[in-house]
Amino acid sequence: MAIYKYTVVAAEDEELLLGNLVKKIEQTGLGFRVIGTALTGSQAYDIVKEKNPDLLITDIRMPVMDGLQLIEKVRNHYPLTRFIITSGYSDFDYAKSAIRLRVSEYLLKPVEPDELYSALFRIRNEFEAERSEYLG
């Protein structure tokens, strides 16, 4: 039985990709549990407000509110939340915006399991380091 330490909300406007992403996250064995999924940025924001996850993984292009707008809104209200962007676009303007918003990782679709594992591993290590620092 896996021990979950970190909560995740995943946002992706393509249901099949969203389902695959959730499976990949939970199969890493790194302690991340998906506590909410959304097909739009506005749905994702509502879930974040309700559940305050440790990590938000979002597609960059979604209806109603795109991933960058979502991250900016979440960052303003929940500054401790970490972010991973998934995108089918390697456009440098998107990457610049992600850097400006202090996104932890930018993964190109289709998201490969080893790339997701590496990204989650780095984020988990950041969480652990912060926890150790906080606990002294």
Predicted regions and their residues:
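Short hydrophobic helical patches associated with two-component signaling proteins
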Residues: 20-25, 116
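Short, Lys/Arg-enriched, disordered terminal segments
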Residues: 1-8, 27-28, 50
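Conserved Asp/Asn-Gly motif in the active-site loop of CheY-like receiver
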Residues: 35-42
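Conserved sequence signature across two-component system core domains
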Residues: 11-12, 38, 56
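A generic structural motif
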Residues: 29-34
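Conserved acidic segment of CheY-like receiver
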Residues: 5-17, 21-22
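CheY-like receiver
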Residues: 45-135
